[in-house]
Amino acid sequence: MFELFKRVFDFVAALLLIAVLGLPMLVIAGVVRLTSRGPALYWSDRVGQFNRIFGMPKFRSMYVGTPPVATHLLANPDAHITPVGKFLRKSSLDELPQLWSVLVGDMSLVGPRPALFNQDDLIKARTDAGVHALRPGITGWAQVNGRDELPIPDKVALDAAYLRERSFSLDLRILWMTLWKVVRRDGVSH
């Protein structure tokens, strides 16, 4: 029953947020296009529920041609970030197009962040912990408890804790904590 309620909540909330944020998202898309060559959106291959690969949209914050790896694995990440990209990442505005993924059911508002398709160690650890059964989220328990600063075992432990304890009240708490962290720009390293 919880999963059905969560899906309905996700759908309605994503629809409302897209309606409210539609114009600002169009402005962001225009700024991305004006400040660097290429499309406004970047579709990243991510690992979803039950390890199914899906395309996750983000506002493009890196130059076209950047290798599709986690930012911290790039030799010089700052050389790949567009003029507006650093701001988009620090403010988490680059994540807004993921509301589309929530709307179509590839993601949830709250759940473990979807791994990149080539993060084999994270994918294996999550599968071993049963976390792969969850729909990935725009935010999650690991996001509000360390975000980019956490090593993989700690992320997976927090994801597994969310799997065991998930509830509507925990989701609301995570959403509130996320809003607070975004406003304070906590835990963003790139």
Residues covered by each model-derived region:
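Hydrophobic structural segments characteristic of membrane proteins
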Residues: V47, P97-H190
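Residue-level "hotspot" positions that anchor or transmit function at local structural transition points
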Residues: I18, H72-N76, H132
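Juxtamembrane loop-helix boundary motifs flanking transmembrane segments in multi-pass membrane proteins
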Residues: M1-L4, N76-H80, E95
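Short, glycine-rich, amphipathic interfacial segments at transmembrane boundaries or analogous
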Residues: A40-H80, I138-A157
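A helix-centric hydrophobic-segment signal that preferentially recognizes long
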Residues: P39, P67, L74, L88, ...
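A hydrophobic, helix-centered structural microdomain
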Residues: M1-V64, S101, F168, R173-H190
